[in-house]
Amino acid sequence: MTERDQLIDLIRQRSFQYSKEPIFTLASGKKSNFYFNLKGVTYYPPGIVLIGALMYDKIQELNLDPAGIGGLTMGADPIAISVAYTSQLRGNPIDAFSVRKEPKAHGLRLPIEGNMEPGDPVIVIEDVVTTGGSTIKAINAVRDYGLEILSVIALLDRCEQNGRENIEACGVNVYSLLTINDFISQ
C-alpha cells in the first residue's frame, strides 16, 4: 500500500464523517453531507510521518525551493512541523512558521512566528480547503510580512464553494495532496 493510500485510510478511520443528510455545519455556515476534522490525523504520530513525507515529496515534485512552510494556526501548524522535520531528515531543511489569527498584544506583536525574514520564499499550507477563506487570510498576512509565496499546498481540497478558485484569484498556484473524490464517489 502506498503512503498516499495509507493516509487516505487513516483519514477515513480518524477524521472523515459522512451522512446521507447534510447535518454538518461548515465554517462557512453551509450544511454538508461530509465533514473532515483532520486534526485526528495531523496530530497522530503515523499521520505526522505520512503527511510530512507526502508534502515534502509534493514540494520536490513541483520543483519548489522554499525557505519556509506554514499557514494559519492551528490547522496548518502540525503539517508545517511534520514537513520541517521530514525536510531535515532528508538533508534539505525547510523552516516551519505559523500565521497568528491575531498578532500578540504584547512583546514583538508579530503576526508570524518562526524564523522567516522578509523576502524569504515560502509555501502556504492548509489542512482543508472549502471556501479558501482561511488560506486567503494566511496569504494576506504572509504578503504583508514581506514573504514571497511560491504556492499553496492543501492536504485536502473539498472541491466545492470555489475554494481553489478563490485562492488562485490571489495570484498563487494551488495544489492538494487529496480531494473529496478520494473519499466519496461522485
Segments and roles (model prediction):
Residues 1-62:
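Active-site-facing substrate-recognition patch
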Residues 64-75, 153-154:
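Short glycine-rich phosphate-binding loop at a beta-alpha junction
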Residues 35, 80-123, 133-136:
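Short, glycine/charge-rich flexible loops or terminal/linker lids adjacent to PRPP-binding catalytic cores
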Residues 2-13, 139-186:
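PRPP-dependent phosphoribosyltransferase catalytic core
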Residues 55-67, 139-145:
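Phosphate/pyrophosphate-binding loops at sites that engage ATP/ADP/AMP, CoA/4′-phosphopantetheine
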